[in-house]
Amino acid sequence: MAISRGDKVRIRRPESYWFNEVGTVASIDTSGIRYPVVVRFEKVNYNGFSGVDGGINTNNFAEAELDPA
């Protein structure tokens, strides 16, 4: 599967906060790291302070954990 920057992908990592969610590929690292694909999402996760907007909206994934959306 060839994933490139800007593609919409569905997350297939069961333990991920974004499991089965759709995100956009922000970048792909070619240096050989374990999780080279950075995916950006519309919503943020649960990391943040109470009453304050914030959290993380990107995460790294392996290509095998992504399906085209």
From Swiss-Prot:
**Predominant localisation class:** membrane
Note the topology in the membrane. Answer: Peripheral membrane protein
Location comes to: Cellular thylakoid membrane
The reply on keyword Membrane is yes
An example Pfam family from this entry, by short name, is: PSI_PsaE
Q: Which domain of life is it from?
A: Bacteria
Per the record, GO CC terms? photosystem I reaction center; plasma membrane-derived thylakoid membrane
Mind listing the UniProt keywords for this protein, alphabetically?
A: Membrane, Photosynthesis, Photosystem I, Thylakoid
According to its UniProt entry, one GO biological process term is: photosynthesis
Family, according to the entry, reads as follows: Belongs to the PsaE family.
The name this protein goes by in its record: Photosystem I reaction center subunit IV
Species the sequence originates in: Synechococcus sp. (strain RCC307)
